[in-house]
Structure formats: C-alpha cells, structure tokens
Regions:
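An interfacial alpha-helical scaffold signature
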Residues: 1-258
Length: 258
C-alpha cells in the first residue's frame, strides 16, 4: 500500500515547513507540516496503525516515538505530544489537507497548551522515606512508651491486648507522619511550580515499599534545579529521591489536546 497517510508525533510552534531529517519509527524521515503558526511532526505512512504480536516490537516502536518527542523538546523549546499511533488518513481529501484543517480548527486550544508547556518538560520525582527509622522514632515516643509501661506486671491476656494496642497506635502515628511528610513535600514543590500531579506508582518491586510519593511536574530548567536543590537538602534526614526527565509533557496536555 502507498504511504498516503501521516503519522503524527506531536505539535510544535514553528510556523513553516521543515525537513527535520530525524529518524523516527522504523527509520522514517520526520518532517513538519505547518498551518496557523503550528507545525506537526510527521512521517509518511500507510493508512493503518503500527501493530505486532511481539510485545518487544511494540515497545521498540513506542520508544522510537518518544525519542522524537524528546529531541523536539530541545530543538523546538517544547512539544505538544500526541499518542503513539496517531495517524491522519486522507479520506475524501489528502492527509496533508486534513492535518492542516485540524491545526486550523484547534488553533486556539493549541495556543493555550503551548503557552503552558513552552520551555518546559515533564519530570518524574519519586521520594522515598526510611521506614525503619520512622518506626523506631514512633516506637520511642512518649505515647507508645506509656502503653509499654502499662504492660509491665499485667497478666498474659491484658499484656497481649496492650501489645496489640501499641502496634495499632504505632501504625496510626506512622501513617499520620507519612501523610504529613507527603503534604509538606507537595506543598513545597508547588511553591516552585503549580503544575504538579501525584501519580500512582507502576513499579512493584521490593525497593518500592518505602515510596512516599510519586510526582509528575512540569518545569523549566530553573524550576527543576530549584526543586532538585530543595530535595538534596533532605538527603540524610530519612529521605531520598530519584529525578527523571525531561520527557514530553503527556500528564499536562491530556485535556487540552483531546
């Protein structure tokens, strides 16, 4: 089949056609098609999605898609990402005509989104706490010590009940502290950038058991350096962190480009 369709990676604010000469999915040449001040990053493709029964092949395709977006962040000072397998078909018109029509019809929404993400990328921040240290601190608190003291000299049944009460109280105090830590980190980072979201962890490994909070933030270089400096001050105080990015800001454009 001929390459009558256009595979679209994302949108940048360029305003003119450019033969970008970046290698996209399956080595396809990526170029831009422009309308109303915005340019779509595209390659020519068939009118069908990229499919494979091999999960590793699909993974490779998605990685290639995301690499184009990562390069676009640096080259065009930002990118409005579109999902893997976004394909514009020709229908009764050419695929290029349909794409330009879409850019024109969505100009106002694209302007709003671009103002939000220009010069910024999405970063993932995972903050961990020292669970053993926290349990030790809570266990040594006056409230828990009083319960333990009351166990002395008591019968086996009452002693067991008091021991269970102590464990329950340790968990309650511990979770209160964890939630307090989480709120404090969130509030402090929000002072740097209002664009942040708590996201569920998709990693299930032993090391994740002490995950305090998993955040996605939209930030420019100055903002992320400030956040990194703040987090580095917390190292050694029972906390550690991992910072990844910048990535295409999927978490912050979902509603704007729908």
């Amino acid at each position: 089949m001929p390459d009558d369709a256009l595979y679209v990676y994302g949108i940048v604010k360029l305003g003119f056609d450019l033969d970008w000469r970046e290698a996209g999915i399956e080595g396809k040449n990526v170029y831009t098609i422009s309308e109303c001040g915005f340019s779509a990053l595209v390659h020519d493709c068939e009118e069908k999605p990229y499919m494979s029964e091999d999960p590793n092949k699909i993974k490779e395709l998605i990685i290639a898609h995301n690499k184009i977006l990562d390069r676009a962040i640096n080259h065009f000072d930002g990118v409005i990402p579109l999902h893997f397998n976004t394909i514009i078909k020709k229908g009764g018109n050419s695929s290029q005509y349909n794409l330009k029509k879409w850019l024109n019809n969505n100009k106002e929404r694209l302007e709003k989104t671009w103002d939000k993400i220009k010069g910024r990328g999405e970063y993932g921040i995972r903050i961990y706490y020292d669970k053993e240290k926290l349990i030790e601190e809570v266990s040594n608190s006056e409230e828990i010590k009083d319960i333990e003291t009351n166990r002395e000299g008591k019968g086996a049944g009452l002693s067991y009940l008091l021991q269970s009460k102590a464990k329950t109280k340790i968990n309650e105090i511990g979770w209160d502290k964890v939630n307090g830590f989480k709120k404090k980190f969130y509030d402090d980072i929000k002072k740097v950038t209002a664009n942040l979201k708590i996201t569920p962890s998709r990693i299930f490994i032993d090391e994740e058991k002490d995950l305090l909070v998993n955040l996605s933030v939209l930030a420019d270089n100055q903002q992320i350096n400030k956040i990194k400096g703040f987090l580095e001050q917390k190292i050694g105080n029972g906390f550690s962190f991992q910072l990844a990015g910048p990535f295409a800001p999927y978490s912050f454009v979902e509603n704007e480009t729908a």
